[in-house]
């Protein structure tokens, strides 16, 4: 919060040798690189990432939907270098480890609201507290809406609009020498597909090579304004649900932790390039 970070991409800008960028062709999908190792083809589901993402002990096999709001996170760790001993495969470059807040013994709550340009309307809230002497509960809700950063000169409207809703309930049971926490998450992200534009490369060799293929030239500055010229906005429909169960048992002067998890994800997107 002190950094005013909103997504993992913001965290990456303050971390040496780390790029936690968003994938260009699939919104809200990570294209993470640590120490030069990563995967640039995350629009293809079969591409294995070299930088793993772990939330509450659950590894993400596919890093769709990881570039979302950081609200309700207790901690974020960026581990550089191979992490196979701890997390198995797909972590040769490193890992991004996140932990959400746990249900508290004390009743408390927090609300965060943001209004910004381009129709940004964000509201997030979390409430936590005891349900009984041995049971604590928590529920967090994240809602984000925006009209889109780009203006489509062909369709005459904004492009890049998205609507995000994430609901994350959790419950903790405490007993003599053990505790068990179940964390569920349901999320839906709907909006436009990727925003693309053609532009004239300011390099003679590249220009001639591109033009030789029959591609039409657009003699414009790609960084001058936030416009796009595609014939359609495209579409994004991304949803997932997950469940993590963490069991901690005091055993012989230490703690034995067991984590079981499942995540089901459905993603459908298309765009005009």
Predicted regions and their residues:
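Short loop/turn motifs enriched for small/polar and acidic residues
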Residues: 35-37, 144, 183-187
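Outer-membrane beta-barrel translocator/receptor signature
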Residues: 49-50, 62, 71-80, 85-152, ...
